[in-house]
Amino acid sequence: MEAVERVNLLGLDGAALSELVGQWGGKPFRARQLQRWVHQRGADSFDAMTDLARDFRAQLARDCVIEALPVNTEQRSSDGTRKWLFDVGQGNAIETVFIPEDDRGTLCISSQAGCVVNCRFCSTGHQGFNRNLRASEIIGQLWWAKRVLEAAADTARLPGGKAGEDTRVISNVVMMGMGEPLLNYDQVLPALRLMLDDNAYGLSRRRVTVSTSGVVPMMDRLSQDCPVALAVSLHAPNDALRDELVPLNKKYPLNALLAACERYLAHAPRDFITFEYCMLDGINDTDQHARELIQLARQVRCKLNLIPFNPFPASGLKRSPSARVRVFAQRLMDAGIVTTVRKTRGDDIDAACGQLAGEVRDRTRITERNATRTIPIQQVHA
């Protein structure tokens, strides 16, 4: 007789969990109790759920699991940034990075192992695409990090404990790790709903950000299903250049993308879209590009986030000099465009989208020795 795969409760949003419990004759409040045990208390054992009936716990133990991805490595930077490398099988791995700041703690999570969008400046795309992550694997990154960080914070508060950033816990989540979230929509959506659910993580929509390269139809769906804060990987002020840097632009050009952004704003928790713009020396950082970008930005309520590029050999690209970035940013601000320059965090542990995952692929796939480095995950202003 073939064994039935047990349900991983990490991947079930409130509606799905209520349906499962209802199939066993349970009431909706039992599902809410169970959800709080899993996501708020971080329980990984049904025996620990002492306010649930013994028979119910036995049913859960037979049919369900609470299981995050295995952790290959964990690293910590001198600035407090922490990075986990999760094993997704077949020699592939994804990264999750926690960035503590004075006023927030931001967790950057992945939605795919690899990426199909293949932006020219991103090493993750050069590595290719392995598979979509399941909802349990997406939310499992948050579940794991929350447990680790809260345990560290509890320890730091003890007499003689270490104060400071050790007490910072997760207040914001950004989907800016590996992958294009909107190309894994059916798994990303329940993960987002769990992040917002008061019986799970209870984050406000303003504190959860999805970053997309511009999958227009799915932007429209997200605006209806779960309108969290939105960041768009722009990186070019015109179609000709964006076609080269972000190949998806050939399918969804800027006029369609900007129209989708405007539609999204009707439902968004913030009154602006964040445009991400990776600064590439001599490619998209000239005064003319700044003028074009100003005209584009005036079409949509937005803010610009300029990102210094971290070169990798396969890209053939260079980082814009710091002086050029400052001049570029000043031109935008002088035109009334809210502009920030992302600050690098976690340099000493290579806290980078896909970077260490690429190294894992190198070690396990001899034919992919040309997989190289990537753009660091840096300070995120969600």
From Swiss-Prot:
List the catalysed reactions: adenosine(2503) in 23S rRNA + 2 reduced [2Fe-2S]-[ferredoxin] + 2 S-adenosyl-L-methionine = 2-methyladenosine(2503) in 23S rRNA + 5'-deoxyadenosine + L-methionine + 2 oxidized [2Fe-2S]-[ferredoxin] + S-adenosyl-L-homocysteine; adenosine(37) in tRNA + 2 reduced [2Fe-2S]-[ferredoxin] + 2 S-adenosyl-L-methionine = 2-methyladenosine(37) in tRNA + 5'-deoxyadenosine + L-methionine + 2 oxidized [2Fe-2S]-[ferredoxin] + S-adenosyl-L-homocysteine
Q: Which GO molecular function annotation, any one, does this entry have? A: rRNA binding
Cofactor(s) named in the record:
[4Fe-4S] cluster
Q: How is the cofactor bound?
A: Binds 1 [4Fe-4S] cluster. The cluster is coordinated with 3 cysteines and an exchangeable S-adenosyl-L-methionine.
PROSITE patterns per the UniProt record, alphabetical: RADICAL_SAM
Q: Which GO terms describe its biological process?
A: rRNA base methylation; tRNA methylation
**Keywords tagged on the record:** 4Fe-4S, Cytoplasm, Disulfide bond, Iron, Iron-sulfur, Metal-binding, Methyltransferase, rRNA processing, S-adenosyl-L-methionine, Transferase, tRNA processing
GO CC annotation, single: cytoplasm
**Misc remark:** Reaction proceeds by a ping-pong mechanism involving intermediate methylation of a conserved cysteine residue.
| Family as reported in the entry's similarity comment | Belongs to the radical SAM superfamily. RlmN family.
Stated name of the protein = Dual-specificity RNA methyltransferase RlmN
Which species does the entry assign this protein to? Bordetella pertussis (strain Tohama I / ATCC BAA-589 / NCTC 13251)
